Amino acid sequence: MLRVVVESASINPPLSTTPKAFVTVYFRDMMKRTRVEEGHDPIWNETLIWHLWNQPLENDSFLKVILQDSVSKKKERFIGLATVPLKRLAQRPKEVMFVRDLILLNHSMKPTNCTVTLHVAQIYDQDTEMTGNEELLGSTVNEVTQKKLMVSGLPMHRALASKPQHFQVRVKVFEARQLLGNNIKPVVKVNIADQQHLTRIKMGNNPFFNEIFFQNFHEVPAKFFEENISIEVVDSAASRSKAEIGRFQTDIGFIYHSPGHTLLRKWLGLCQRNKTTSGVRGYLKVTICALGVGDQALVDQKLPYEQNTRVQIFKSKEVPVSLAYLQFFIYCAEDLHFGTHKSATPVLEVELIGDKLRTKPQNPSDNPIWNQILTFQIQLPCLSSYIKFRVMDCSKYKCQDEIGSASLCLSQISSTGEEIQGMYSGFLPCFGPSFLTLRGGKKPPFRTSEEGTCIMDAVQHGLAYRGRIFVEIVTKIKSQQDSVMKDLSQEVTQVEMQYYRQKYGLCVIFLSCTMMPKFKDLIQFEVSMGHYGNKTDPNYKPLVSTTQYSPVIYDGTTYHYVPWYNTKPVVAVTSNWEDVGFRMNCLNLLHITRDRLKTNLDILKSIRNPRDPALLQQWEKLLKELQEDCRRPLPCMTDQPRANSLDRNKWQLRSQLLQQLAQMAKEAKPVNMVGTAKEWLHRLNAVIPEPQESLPDVLIWLMSRQQRVAYARVPAHTVLFSPAGPLSSGKFCGKIQNILLQYPEGEGQDTFPASLRVCMWLGNVKYSKNLKLLQQGSMVVYAETYENQAKTRDDWGQQGLYHCPNFSDVMGRKALPKTDFKAPPGWHWKDDWVVEPQRRLLLDIDINKSQVLEEVYENQLRNATGAWVPAAIPNTDVNGQPVEALENVKCPQGWHFKKNWIVKLNHAVDSEGWEYGVGIPPSGLPQIWNSVEKTYHSCRRRRWVRVRFRNHKELGQERSQEQETLSFLQMQDLSEEGKEGWEYGTFDSRFHLDPQPTSRFRRRCWHRQLAPNKDRGVASIFLLEGSLAVEQKDQPRKEMEKTRSWQPWKDLRHTPEDPRIPTTPFIYYILNKPHYYQLFCYIYQARNLMYNQILTFQEPFIQVVFLNHSLCTQTLRSSAAPTWSQSIIFQHLLLFEDPKDTRENPPLVVLELWQHDSRGNKILWGRSMWPPVVWLGLQDWVFTPLRWHPLVRELGEEEGEILASCELILETQKLKELHPPILSIPCKDGIYLLPKNIQPTMKMMAIEIMAWGLRNMTKVRYPQLLLECGGESLKTEPISNFQENPNFPTSTFFFTVFMPLEETHAQPLVVKVVDNQEYGQQIVVGQANIDFLQPYFCDPWSLNYTTVKLPTLSVKKPDTFLDFVYKKFWFDSSKDEEVYEEEVDWWSKLFWATGDADKSLNYNHKSYHTLKVYDCELEAVLTFKGLQDFCQTFKLYQEKPKVDSPVVGEFKGLFRIYPFPEDPEAPKPPRQFSAWPEIEDFPQMCLVRVYLIRAINLQPQDYNGLCDPYVILKLGQTKLGSRDSYYPNTLDPIFGMMYELTCNIPLEKDLEIQLFDFDLITADDEIGSTVIDLENRLLSGFGARCGLSKSYCKSGPFKWRDQMTPSYLLYRYAKQKGLPPPVFDLEGDSLYYNGETFKLQSFESAPPTYKHLGPKKERLALYILNTQGLVPEHVETRTLHSNSQPGIDQGKIQMWVDIFPKMLGPPGPQVNISPRKPKRYQLRCIIWSTAEVDLVQETFSKEKMSDIYVKGWLFGLEEDTQKTDVHYHSLTGEATFNWRFIFTMDYLTTERACVQSQKDYIWSLDPTSTKFPARLMIQIWDNDFFSPDDFLGVLELDLSDMPLPAQNIKQCSLKMMETDSKWPFTPQKRISLFKKTNVTGWWPCQVLDGDKWRLSGKVKMTLEMLSEREALIRPAGRGQSEPNQFPMLHPPERNDSFLLWYQSPIKNFCYAVCKRYRSKIICLVVTLVIGFILLNFVYSAPSYFAMNWIKPQLRLSSPIKIVNLIGTVNTSNINSSILTMEGSTYHASHVFPEAPAP
């Protein structure tokens, strides 16, 4: 296969609208495309694969690469193309060809600045497990393969908002293979979120489903991504406990972030969940996609029942699939937060892809110890994004209350190895042992960024700290799983070292708090780290974790701020955590590398001009710093005793990546700089996340009225101190940083909470001895209490306090007597108590206001005579409180009045300003006021107002005023001044120093300063632990009773839960030396403010905010790209910071874009924030150049950008003497302009306009066009009769204008349509704003035609010896078959184009008749420029439109912009709109033919998951289509219809195609619709009116359909391009065109043999036309959309449109696209016999036997199941039947599928048509009388691709069913029964035994396929019934084995005994024979050995003589006679003569 990895691209010069780029790659006319990525430097790293099959690469092979921009509304914009020759790869197939920075060409084939980077390689079968159609069904146990399949590496997430959005999930189930089980009836359950969908029940182990399920969502993306998808295959015939066959699970987030949001045609391994013996139990082929608004579903062109999938992909080389087990070692938890519950029973729940396991419940404790192991079985690849942990409260037998949650990203605890280029294999998931932080409570707002690597980070978890869990994760790969849950034993002792804790100290200095909304109450900040510092947690020591209460002050424009000035509050929090410094050091080093790279990249991206010299300088700086950072070694983890497996694996991964990046930076060249740097940054971001950062984040809460309002989360590692050095410390450790606060989710969405500027330090307290965060200032620690007094009878004292204590805190909630304070350990009292007012609380409410409205109400009462007299209290405020009289109200110092008191008359009052009412006791104030006097009214009042203005002061006075404010805020002792320091007021109102006549309450603040003791080795502020006041248990009982009843007057609306609020000291950092600065902001322009480029900005202006100061630019008129060209100057800015600290971390400058709505209200559009450039002098100062900065909206989405720059200059002593401002900035009318050094350069540009006409405008009479650009305007002539001809009488216009030389700075072009009405009135009826002019810039001298490229003709190469051997000995499966050419039609062309049915079609002339199938709209094909090459369509809107404003019309036109010489004598460039269609030819009458092919994946509308679609066409007033012609019960209808319409273009130009769902009773629902602009197709120069065929045929099935011949088309094309007409020779085989001669032989290597081709002249002209990039004969795929779900894909429709203008002659012939009708076939299957069938029954003699019968059916036609008779008592597994099965099917030969139409239910209105593959199912069964029949085996044959049967039993085996053989010269023979219509032989049957398939029998069959006609000619009956012929089947001769026992018992007994004990008898006989031989040998061996040893040689010379010693016989006395041997007379020599004599 050929693999192309598309890495990245660079689009230069950048487009004003952020492009959504993708790359399309063509190889051998097969197109593949990448996903869409936003940005000018997109990075894909996406792999595209083409299968070469048996066609290897040749020297002339090439790739065509096209870079496109997917713009809005289904249009795509061409960017550039290039061709990559593959000659080098063909010659060196083992190498990888890297193509870096490939320069793209434009339409004129000229180089552009856009580049693409990719690499190409060839992959062979032995190198990968991927085979056939990119489907993976197994993998080996190779470690590298397993790790690379774990999770998707380097995910790229696009930013999503937190508001609910429309989403859609689709799951299409194709088929299953190799499902385990016997005689199963599988059904697939698809669970999407909580909705379950079921397929139809099928039969067999390889079922075919082809069903699709939809699920729509309207959810927040965070919740949508968390939902799971579960696909389960169950056996519907089995019991519920044994029904599950296998399942597959994933989460939607994983699918959404996959390429194309889709898993396309993937084989899923099915496994049983948590089963110890479970393996892969089958495979399921599915397509899963998750789509959002605007996402396009991938088009699957293949047939669902295509048979290209070979059996070998189901066979793995070593193991079926990679199975692994994730073991979770759950140790313990700590610091669990139970909320309102005092105790809970904690249980830890772990969730992985929907599977959940829980630990055992523990006793109620906040530190539970579980010590358990939870085991999950996973399949590699594990298609999940994260692991969830939840600690639940199960105290009430229900685990519903969640204590806290955490999550782990699989991509962060594992690696696929994709981060590093090379052989790095990654590592499997592992974690810990380490702590995970639990969170709960309020959630943060959802945001995802491109830098994120996990969508679950800080998304679904809360903000509040809920404790930590101590866990460990281990991945094991083994064949058998352990128990799901078990207890830990020895592992606990190995992790005890994790419990060692160290004391950490956290110090935070608050420097400023600005950009706040208005708070009526006092605010304070709380800092916490875990539970430490949380005031509401009583389990921890009180710490100095909160600041003093402060008010918020108005800044003079929009926001408020906290007036800290030189007194900065400080908090100090101590905590105890384990030592993770070794881990944080590595993380901080990586963050330094990433941050410096990102900073340099942002600067690089902001330089839009490629000719800017700063571009290369910044690139060199980036490379230099990256090399320095990457060569810095990371702390080694191999020698770290506390490091775990994940630490070591990540250290290895990070180290190798840094080494690789350093080398790449060293070799990098200045090409595609932004894209290369973005790729490096992306790879760094992938390895940076540290999941084992067990330290919780630092939380800063903004609190008001004891409620947490807004928060900021600071990662602990960013402020952590490291003794290893500053590089290992956090980037903000001891440094000033800017923090933006956020509201929790769902709160405060309309305001900005605050912008904080803080300095933080976190570290081990032993390193804090010499802690000094700021370079100047001193720290003050003091205790505080307030003395309270009330006024009773004109005397101040404690008598009138009632519920308020004598001494309390600032809120009056707690008693704090001075005698109860005690110094904390390590500190002592420095002085005695002194009175020091908190002047921050006493600031004037009118500070920073330029004008104040004062009001006094004059009150009168009606006396007894009815006259009005002054009331008892004549002057009050609006609430009735007494105030001074009008004449006594004095103007404060520094203010003045312009007008005196006047009566306000602009509300419901009478002519004198009085309003009347009836007084209601006891207050006497009326509840309702009326403007008309009645006799019963008892009182009246009127409102007197006046405005006072602040005096304007000079520079010196301003400084003195600033010093006054500072001196007022300074803390000082008042005892020496004779003042007592009392503050007058109430807790509900503001306190002030001056008493008022109505004052009844006063208080004063007492301070006592603390001083640290002698040095203790740590910073003294970390010793401030515990409460300063005496605990309540130490107080007297009376005092305790008194404190219980204390109430702070009337303002205690929120009381704390614990009344014992701890008393802690307050810490302040005093900075007495201020520094003054001047800030210069240069603002030029804002653009790209709307993605759809519709709305204009009404009176926009920019507000610049810097700390507590803000200024605004001038307000402009309405504009889509407002240009201010203005400088904003802030003078005398006061900062209490060291200038070096300010230069290193300056405050942020905030630019806010505002506009006005129709009511005049200000609306915030977006903000842009960045730090200014700081200059501490003007020695090296230069102007800061303008840069583009993104505008961020309220939810974090970047939309729009602003061109600006800022610089902050310190006012040194020399600069203070200069007149402000210190820089010379030009000023005009009081407005500072941009300095000339940074203004864009202007140049004269020519703008040509081709104004074609107006469309779809109603109620206009004489419209005309008005164009405005850069202060210049142009008007066209009005259209005289708009209703008859909406085109302009003159189409081309020209004018010049001065524009910026840089295209990115071009001013917008405004197109207005002005209607001339009666009496000369002109009204603007429509407007379009074109602010993106870059596509219209052109080179006027370039040529506008495409050169003809001659094709490279292939030359047949001579066969080599290996080729000869291959062809000689390779047995092709189709070698012996005749060439099969079936009848071709238009559908054949479609299948040739989509690649379907390749095996079934073998048409010799296929190459002559090809068409192009586009998977998108024709307008979306990049090469055709949206069919708007002649004129573009601009939507017209109202003059002041809103977001939902409708389109009021369209303007069709085009623009060309190019430099124009200012010298009148210079040559003028040629006009661009010279050769265009004659405008007099329009309107035109046209004949339109609409060919509707089919629809794909329509949205279901009915309850059965289907719909009944029908088509309605609308064109002008014409409407075609009928609801009666609906297609019942289908989501993929095949229309095959042609509609013919007549229209008048352009009056009738919009063709609307609607699909409706037919409903019998209710109204029909619209499925979706699509609109085609016919005028664009008619006018386009790409010939879109009629696609160009590949061949010119005068007759035949593919007859030329255009109304013009190719030669005339070529003549018109040359005329359109301004070229001379082509000239043909007399014979027509040569052509002179555009200065070149072309011959027909250049395109045809040999004379064509196809008989229907036309003459040579036309063929040659057609060849030339096909090289010009014209629209070919095609089928386009259009997306359907519906108003019910805007932006969501509702399905696709494939179609094409032909347009024939009547002025060009009669139209061409129609194309017959009628759907193919299936042919009826009859399959006759004769079951002759079986053999070697398993025997499953026992006879009386324990003999195995079976009663065999055979069952068969066609797949999908299970209701027509047939079976043979029963062969009883088979003792050998042999059975004879002679039985005929007859099956009838409707078969589509071209699609290789059977078609069936039947009703699902009796009450169904229409039948449902289904297609399924032609498969024959044969099963062997054992017949039982009482119990269910036993299943013995199954055979499944695909009739279109089946193995050739064996001719004898011995050759029949399971190897026949394999598609590929192990040996290349012995392939398995495969046939199609539709071609070879009759076969006979043996086939194997198999049965599942355990988890493996084995041979269970063999069946001999004859399969015969007959057409319907042949079946009528040769009729036959089923079984053995009549007509029993062809052939005649006789009943088999079967002997009843049961009766044979009685007929020949001895014979049968011997047979039974021999059969049963055959082996035993043979063994016994052999044993007896061997035993007899051995016994005989043992018996004879001793004698033989003895004789052999002795060797006797016996020789006898004479016999032995016997002598009668008695002499005579005494017969009378026999008893006395004795016979003796005379041995004494003979010698031994007589016996042995050889013996020597004695």
Curated annotation (Swiss-Prot):
Tissue expression notes: Expressed in differentiating myoblasts and myotubes.
For molecular function, the Gene Ontology terms on record are: metal ion binding
Q: What is its main location?
A: membrane
Q: Identify the SUPFAM superfamilies for this entry.
A: C2 domain (Calcium/lipid-binding domain, CaLB) (SSF49562)
One of the record's GO cellular component terms: plasma membrane
Q: Which residues bind Ca(2+) 1?
A: 1502, 1508, 1557-1559
Cofactor(s) needed, names only, are:
Ca(2+)
Q: Which residue windows are transmembrane per the record?
A: 1961-1981
Q: Where does Ca(2+) 2 bind?
A: 1502, 1557, 1559, 1565
| Localization terms from the record | Cell membrane; Membrane
| Keyword terms, alphabetized | Calcium, Cell membrane, Membrane, Metal-binding, Repeat, Transmembrane, Transmembrane helix
| Membrane topology term | Single-pass membrane protein
InterPro entries per the record? Answer: C2_dom, C2_domain_sf, C2B_Ferlin, C2D_Ferlin, C2E_Ferlin, C2F_Ferlin, FerIin_dom, Ferlin
* Induction of its expression: Up-regulated during myotube formation.
The record lists Ca(2+) 3 as bound by 1824, 1827, 1830
Can you give the residue ranges of the C2 domain? Answer: 1-100, 145-265, 307-424, 1055-1186, 1225-1345, 1467-1587, 1705-1853
Q: Describe the protein's quaternary organization and the partners it interacts with.
A: Interacts (via second C2 domain) with EHD1 and EHD2.
Name the protein family: Belongs to the ferlin family.
Any idea what job this protein has? Plays a role in myoblast fusion; probable mediator of endocytic recycling for membrane trafficking events during myotube formation.
PANTHER family in UniProt: FER-1-LIKE, FER-1-LIKE PROTEIN 5
Q: What is this protein called?
A: Fer-1-like protein 5
Q: Which organism is it from?
A: Mus musculus (Mouse)
Write the gene name: Fer1l5
